Amino acid sequence: MSDTTQSPNSYMPVLISACLLLMLSFGLRSGFGLFLQPMSEANGWGRDVLALALAIQNLSWGISAVIAGGFVNRFGTTKVLLGGIVLYGLGTLGMASSTTGLSANLTAGVIIGAGIAGTSFGIVLPAIARAVPAEKQGWALGIGTAAGSAGQFLIVPAAQVFIDWLGWLGALQLMGLLGFGMAVFVIPLARYGNEAGAAPAGTAEISLWQLTRRALAVRSYVLLLVGFYVCGYHLAFITVHMPGYVVDLGFTPQVGAWSIGTIGLCNIFGAYYSGVASGKRPKHTMLSAIYVARAIAILAFLLLPPSLFSILGFSAAMGFLWLSTIPPTSGLVAQFFGVRHMPYLYGLVFLSHQLGSFSGVWLGGYLYETTGNYDGIWLSGAALGLLAALLHWPIKEQSYEASLSAASASH
């Protein structure tokens, strides 16, 4: 982090631009689940077809996040963001014209996934972390994460309105154009991204292979990486399948949209609180508590009779916990290894998250088509929440940055 980044006048424009970009990126992505039912019906598909494409999207997002993190070190944040924006917009427009499972897998899956990777938390949060003073990193990461949730709250209900007015096809085309609009917010971020690849004076360069091998030798990092799989499992399943699940319970599609929107609204507060708290409290115990609370919320939702109150109550509870994992998780990566390698090493952790996302989305669609309900995926989500809590508990919060330049690392 540069010494010139200490004044609020220097970092606030960066933070505001980053937040607006994340609002669009995360908000648009969160709206794709609304198209599961109408697009499937229009093309004569079962829900498993588009669910597979959206599962591939999450997998592509995760794999591309690692690649994008490496590209940031080499080419800088600006070029990665612009490349991601182009892919995001083209993929969304391509999804609108997809009439086969294969084309949906390519557009809604591979291309949009790569676009999200280039415009989402793994690229933008490290730029925020570099822009603000160290003592404000937790707060700033919480603000950035909350902005993504604000996008979910605002854009998902708006997307449902667009579907009602324009039909699913017109709404999806409009979302593609909005994706291109993210380019407006890239310029202020350039100042804190383009020198990411430069090694500090007197420090030897390290290859991505060496960086990966040495980071994976740190036990606490591996526990964090494995535990984040569960976060992706929860978030992606609910984002994609909750609207259809609500309709199956006998409610209107608008209730499904407001369920996702309520998650986004409550997560604005949850993510902000998490960011503030992660600067004051042990991050690993916060993560354990979050995953236990998710498991309890899921089980309570299954046990309560279906009603508007139970749907919105679950959405509010899960929303408060939704992206509250990101400030402590990204903060731990920065604490372990510093901010220079954060885009790549957070990208590896996020790849685990997206493997969980792929599992949750695909398995949800598969179980629905084979059993006719979502009970199995809900129960597995509760069980995995408890497992994640156990995985995070033994994490040791300390710096392992020296291990990246050591001949060997074993912690």
Functional labels for PLM-detected ranges:
Residues M23, G91, S103-T119, Y229, ...:
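Hydrophobic core of transmembrane alpha-helices in multi-pass small-molecule transporters
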Residues F32-L36, V218-Y272:
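Extracytoplasmic gate region of multi-pass secondary transporters
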Residues M39, G118-V132, S324-F337:
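Intracellular juxtamembrane helix-capping segments at the cytosolic ends
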Residues I63-L102:
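Conserved MFS/SLC helix-loop-helix module at the cytosolic interface between two early adjacent transmembrane helices
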Residues S64-T77, A271-P282, E369:
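Helix-to-loop junctions at the C-terminal end of transmembrane segments
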Residues A108-A146:
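Cytoplasmic helix-loop-helix junction between adjacent transmembrane helices
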Residues G144-N194:
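Helix-loop-helix hairpin linking two adjacent transmembrane segments in secondary transporters
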Residues V255, I263-N267, K280-L332:
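C-terminal transmembrane helical hairpin of 12-TM major facilitator-type secondary transporters
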